[in-house]
Every structure is written in C-alpha cells, then in structure tokens.
Amino acid sequence: MPNEAPKSKILSYRRSHFVTRLPVGFLYSPSHCWLQRCNDEGLWRVGITKFASRMLGEMVDFGFELKPADPAKTGQIIGWLEGFKAISDVYCVVEGAFAGSNPALEKKIGFIDKDPYQKGWLYEATGEPDPKCMNVDDYVTVLDKTIDKILENQSADEIN
C-alpha cells in the first residue's frame, strides 16, 4: 500500500475566487470527499476536497470514533474535523470496514489543507463506495452549483 497516491491526471477548476486542481481518476462525494482506489481488494483512501478544507478553514484538530476493522456504513458519522472556521462531522463514504486513519496527520494536520489529495488523506476503508459518489466531471457540476449558491447568498446578504 503506497504512502502517497500516485500522480494522476489533473483537472484545473476555477469558479469566482475559488481555484483548485482535481485528480481525474478519483471519485467524489456530494459532501466534498474524494476517494481513491488503493488496490484490487477494495481498499479506498478517503480525504476531503480543497473546497471542503477551505470552508472549514485551517485545520486544528481531528478524531475518529472507529478502530481498524470496525464495520462502517455509508452516511455513518465516523469522526470529526475542526478548522478555524467550523467543526464538521466526518461521514463514511465507503460501505464495509474502517481500515484506519492517516498516521501522518497526528504530526502534521496541515497536510489536510496543504496537500489534500496526497499526504492529507483522512482514512482508509475496505468495501464499496457510496453509490452517490461520482467522477470528476459530475463533481465539477456539484461544485458549480454549490459555489453559485454561496455567491447568491452573499449577494442577498449585501442587499439586506
């Protein structure tokens, strides 16, 4: 099992003031997680997208409620992330078993912000991805709609 995800093709994305690079071969959840298949036995590495980390702000703490080999269901709260802007539950996006959290984050939680698609992964799980997960092109559509809604709300707040 690799310590870092292999280099993959990248899609450059820009909408309003948000710019990111999205690995093409990953799956993405509507809740702004990414999934990368690690092997043919159904091991998936999971992290949050640059968009999600930006919404939470600089990471300050995290924790997981499951131990390796514990069963995990899609949609189940398995942990939490705390950023300067917000605290968020971490939901499982793989139906199967929790394989463990990223040990590198214990020493450098900033990997979540600075290198979300390589060193900043959150956890690994074996099983099947949530059927709501999508390819990068479909995720771009989700990002567009999400950012447009944020901009719409900001405009409404400025008017009021």
What are the residue ranges of the model-derived segments?
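Flexible, gly/ser-rich surface segments that form the specificity/activation loops bordering the active-site cleft
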Residues: 81-83
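Non-catalytic terminal segments and appended small domains
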Residues: 1-77, 88, 97-160
